Protein backbone atom coordinates (compact mmCIF):
# COMPACT_ATOMS: atom_id res chain seq x y z
CA UNK A 1 0.00 0.00 0.00
CA UNK A 2 1.20 3.51 -0.80
CA UNK A 3 0.32 6.79 0.88
CA UNK A 4 -1.97 9.24 -0.90
CA UNK A 5 -4.40 12.09 -0.30
CA UNK A 6 -7.31 10.63 -2.27
CA UNK A 7 -8.31 7.79 -4.56
CA UNK A 8 -8.71 4.18 -3.53
CA UNK A 9 -7.76 4.76 0.07
CA UNK A 10 -8.83 2.67 3.02
CA UNK A 11 -11.10 5.54 4.10
CA UNK A 12 -12.73 5.85 0.66
CA UNK A 13 -13.20 2.10 0.33
CA UNK A 14 -14.83 1.78 3.75
CA UNK A 15 -17.13 4.72 3.08
CA UNK A 16 -18.21 3.20 -0.25
CA UNK A 17 -18.74 -0.26 1.27
CA UNK A 18 -20.79 1.06 4.20
CA UNK A 19 -23.06 2.91 1.76
CA UNK A 20 -23.61 -0.26 -0.31
CA UNK A 21 -24.30 -2.38 2.78
CA UNK A 22 -26.69 0.19 4.27
CA UNK A 23 -28.69 0.27 1.03
CA UNK A 24 -29.00 -3.51 1.27
CA UNK A 25 -30.18 -3.20 4.88
CA UNK A 26 -27.29 -5.19 6.33
CA UNK A 27 -27.65 -5.06 10.12
CA UNK A 28 -24.09 -3.93 10.98
CA UNK A 29 -22.67 -2.33 7.82
CA UNK A 30 -19.68 -0.68 9.50
CA UNK A 31 -18.54 -3.87 11.20
CA UNK A 32 -19.01 -5.95 8.06
CA UNK A 33 -17.18 -3.40 5.87
CA UNK A 34 -14.26 -3.33 8.34
CA UNK A 35 -14.16 -7.10 8.70
CA UNK A 36 -14.10 -7.71 4.95
CA UNK A 37 -11.37 -5.14 4.33
CA UNK A 38 -9.30 -6.62 7.16
CA UNK A 39 -9.82 -10.01 5.51
CA UNK A 40 -8.74 -8.74 2.07
CA UNK A 41 -5.70 -6.83 3.36
CA UNK A 42 -4.70 -9.50 5.91
CA UNK A 43 -4.26 -6.87 8.58
CA UNK A 44 -5.68 -6.15 12.00
CA UNK A 45 -8.25 -3.53 12.98
CA UNK A 46 -5.60 -1.21 14.46
CA UNK A 47 -3.64 -1.11 11.20
CA UNK A 48 -6.86 -0.48 9.28
CA UNK A 49 -7.81 2.50 11.46
CA UNK A 50 -4.34 4.02 11.72
CA UNK A 51 -3.66 3.93 7.96
CA UNK A 52 -6.87 5.43 6.59
CA UNK A 53 -5.04 7.42 3.89
CA UNK A 54 -3.12 4.46 2.46
CA UNK A 55 -4.03 3.47 -1.09
CA UNK A 56 -5.26 -0.07 -1.66
CA UNK A 57 -3.86 -1.73 -4.78
CA UNK A 58 -6.25 -2.45 -7.64
CA UNK A 59 -6.33 -6.23 -7.15
CA UNK A 60 -7.37 -5.81 -3.51
CA UNK A 61 -9.98 -3.19 -4.47
CA UNK A 62 -11.52 -5.64 -6.96
CA UNK A 63 -11.54 -8.45 -4.40
CA UNK A 64 -13.07 -6.16 -1.76
CA UNK A 65 -15.81 -4.97 -4.11
CA UNK A 66 -16.74 -8.55 -4.99
CA UNK A 67 -16.97 -9.46 -1.31
CA UNK A 68 -19.03 -6.37 -0.47
CA UNK A 69 -21.50 -7.13 -3.25
CA UNK A 70 -21.69 -10.72 -2.03
CA UNK A 71 -22.42 -9.50 1.51
CA UNK A 72 -24.94 -6.97 0.13
CA UNK A 73 -26.81 -9.92 -1.37
CA UNK A 74 -27.10 -11.24 2.21
CA UNK A 75 -24.51 -14.02 2.04
CA UNK A 76 -23.45 -14.42 5.70
CA UNK A 77 -20.15 -12.79 6.58
CA UNK A 78 -18.87 -16.08 8.02
CA UNK A 79 -19.41 -17.87 4.70
CA UNK A 80 -17.54 -15.11 2.87
CA UNK A 81 -14.51 -15.21 5.19
CA UNK A 82 -14.79 -18.95 5.83
CA UNK A 83 -14.27 -18.42 9.54
CA UNK A 84 -16.35 -18.06 12.70
CA UNK A 85 -15.37 -17.58 16.33
CA UNK A 86 -17.02 -19.82 18.92
CA UNK A 87 -16.01 -19.99 22.59
CA UNK A 88 -12.82 -18.04 21.73
CA UNK A 89 -11.84 -20.63 19.11
CA UNK A 90 -11.77 -20.14 15.33
CA UNK A 91 -13.69 -22.62 13.16
CA UNK A 92 -13.79 -23.06 9.40
CA UNK A 93 -17.25 -22.84 7.85
CA UNK A 94 -18.77 -22.84 4.38
CA UNK A 95 -22.23 -23.26 2.87
CA UNK A 96 -22.25 -26.98 3.76
CA UNK A 97 -22.11 -26.22 7.49
CA UNK A 98 -24.49 -24.24 9.67
CA UNK A 99 -22.93 -21.17 11.26
CA UNK A 100 -22.67 -21.75 15.03
CA UNK A 101 -25.17 -19.58 16.86
CA UNK A 102 -24.21 -17.55 19.94
CA UNK A 103 -26.94 -19.38 21.89
CA UNK A 104 -25.06 -22.63 21.33
CA UNK A 105 -22.29 -21.29 23.58
CA UNK A 106 -24.84 -21.42 26.43
CA UNK A 107 -25.43 -25.09 25.64
CA UNK A 108 -21.69 -25.81 25.74
CA UNK A 109 -21.28 -23.86 29.00
CA UNK A 110 -24.18 -25.81 30.56
CA UNK A 111 -22.64 -29.14 29.51
CA UNK A 112 -19.26 -28.03 30.87
CA UNK A 113 -20.81 -27.07 34.22
CA UNK A 114 -22.59 -30.42 34.52
CA UNK A 115 -19.62 -32.50 33.32
CA UNK A 116 -17.02 -30.75 35.47
CA UNK A 117 -19.12 -31.35 38.57
CA UNK A 118 -19.30 -35.08 37.82
CA UNK A 119 -15.76 -35.88 36.72
CA UNK A 120 -13.95 -38.18 39.12
CA UNK A 121 -10.16 -38.19 39.34
CA UNK A 122 -8.58 -40.63 36.88
CA UNK A 123 -11.87 -40.99 34.97
CA UNK A 124 -12.60 -39.77 31.49
CA UNK A 125 -15.79 -38.23 30.21
CA UNK A 126 -17.30 -39.58 27.02
CA UNK A 127 -19.44 -37.14 25.07
CA UNK A 128 -20.90 -37.94 21.67
CA UNK A 129 -22.08 -35.32 19.22
CA UNK A 130 -24.22 -36.35 16.26
CA UNK A 131 -24.27 -34.16 13.15
CA UNK A 132 -21.04 -32.42 14.05
CA UNK A 133 -20.98 -29.80 11.27
CA UNK A 134 -18.09 -27.44 12.00
CA UNK A 135 -17.18 -29.39 15.13
CA UNK A 136 -17.61 -26.34 17.33
CA UNK A 137 -19.46 -28.14 20.13
CA UNK A 138 -17.20 -31.22 20.31
CA UNK A 139 -13.96 -29.24 19.97
CA UNK A 140 -15.03 -26.65 22.56
CA UNK A 141 -16.01 -29.38 25.01
CA UNK A 142 -12.79 -31.33 24.42
CA UNK A 143 -10.65 -28.22 24.88
CA UNK A 144 -12.40 -27.17 28.08
CA UNK A 145 -12.68 -30.62 29.65
CA UNK A 146 -9.06 -31.68 29.12
Language-model features: where?
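SAM-dependent Rossmann-like transferase core, predominantly class I methyltransferases
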Residues: 62-146
